[in-house]
């Protein structure tokens, strides 16, 4: 009978959360432990706010760097387009001349085409693989419709430059649009009084304390979405404060990410323009319009002879124009490559900005998830329910303290504290709260 009464007594003590070995933990002690743990959670919430403000500073710095790079990019774009215009002008003037050396070039072209087709199809079958039959028919038609004069003036290189220019302009427009929408959202966000007014340290104390801080009334924000409509000195209200913020962060990141990994966003590769290897780009161009096959002219002697045909004896002016065309073409290719390098740098800057927007979600999103909590009369967001002490089950047994807490809306969380951190240690509840918050964040990430 005594044993039964003892078990009932222990169970009742456990239910009231007052067991620590043989020593009772009073309600006042549990309350004080809850207060100390809640203060740590409060500091972590304030750190989340500071962290977001640091992200704001980084984004502003990145934006200034982006503007500088954009200025360089615009200048490079102008130089490239000037060179392209000169190339097109020279091409137009050259086409206006009657075709000279026509018989010589046509004879060489008839010998060039079979070699070019064979070389291209071997490459396609080995590297590109899919759809060789269709590509072969398209190539046959393309070569029959092409002129050796087009070949002679490097028309394929000119067309590639023009197509590349179109793609580069599109990529830049997409990046600018996505960045402008993202920064517009961020500007709206950081204009809110939540970020523009800071509490004075002399008046600040924990929102978990018993006393309300005196209210300070600010003019209502012009934002439709107000992040913190109540006083900064009132108790924390997660629904009003954090949820709208993280929704806007998510919107800003979506505005940038919508195009970041799409094919339209990828900068065109120009290595093949100046002779560099880029098999994927060549495969794509061959499938698109067969002009990629013309890049293999160096492997066919008769094709090379077409490029070497000298018509200056028949028309010196035409030869001079061709030289001007080749010079402007080389310059345009160099400037196009340089512009593409700058465009890729700009793209990396944009990706870096997107990753900065991701940091608040990674580090502080747990705070926004508190928005669904019911703000009840309970002033504690970490409440200690039980404290027990026993010997650990390990190869080297030692005394440990187990603390069961509820953090926000969580199920009970059991935290084990080694004997090195005694309950009298000022760091005891900070350690408990830190481990509880780690468990809480881990579970929220899984959910």
From Swiss-Prot:
A motif (Nuclear localization signal) lies at residues 77-80, 441-445. GO terms for molecular function: misfolded protein binding; ubiquitin protein ligase binding; unfolded protein binding. It is found in: Secreted; Nucleus; Cytoplasm; Mitochondrion membrane. Proteolytically cleaved on its way through the secretory system, probably within the Golgi lumen. Proteolytic cleavage is not necessary for its chaperone activity. All non-secreted forms are not proteolytically cleaved. Chaperone activity of uncleaved forms is dependent on a non-reducing environment. One of its GO terms (cellular component) is perinuclear region of cytoplasm. Disulfide bonds join 101-311, 112-303, 115-300, 120-293, 128-283. It is a peripheral membrane protein. One of its GO terms (biological process) is positive regulation of NF-kappaB transcription factor activity. The modification Phosphoserine is found at residues 132, 394. SMART domains: CLa, CLb. Residues 1-22 form the signal peptide. Its main location: secreted. Glycans are attached at residues 85, 102, 144, 289, 326, 352, 372. The keyword Membrane applies. Keywords: Chaperone, Cytoplasm, Cytoplasmic vesicle, Disulfide bond, Endoplasmic reticulum, Glycoprotein, Membrane, Microsome, Mitochondrion, Nucleus, Phosphoprotein, Secreted, Signal, Ubl conjugation. InterPro entries: Clusterin, Clusterin-like, Clusterin_C, Clusterin_CS, Clusterin_N. Antiparallel disulfide-linked heterodimer of an alpha chain and a beta chain. Self-associates and forms higher oligomers. Interacts with a broad range of misfolded proteins, including APP, APOC2 and LYZ. Slightly acidic pH promotes interaction with misfolded proteins. Forms high-molecular weight oligomers upon interaction with misfolded proteins. Interacts with APOA1, LRP2, CLUAP1 and PON1. Interacts with the complement membrane attack complex. Interacts (via alpha chain) with XRCC6. Belongs to the clusterin family. Functions as extracellular chaperone that prevents aggregation of non native proteins. Prevents stress-induced aggregation of blood plasma proteins. Inhibits formation of amyloid fibrils by APP, APOC2, B2M, CALCA, CSN3, SNCA and aggregation-prone LYZ variants (in vitro). Does not require ATP. Maintains partially unfolded proteins in a state appropriate for subsequent refolding by other chaperones, such as HSPA8/HSC70. Does not refold proteins by itself. This is Clusterin. It comes from Oryctolagus cuniculus (Rabbit).
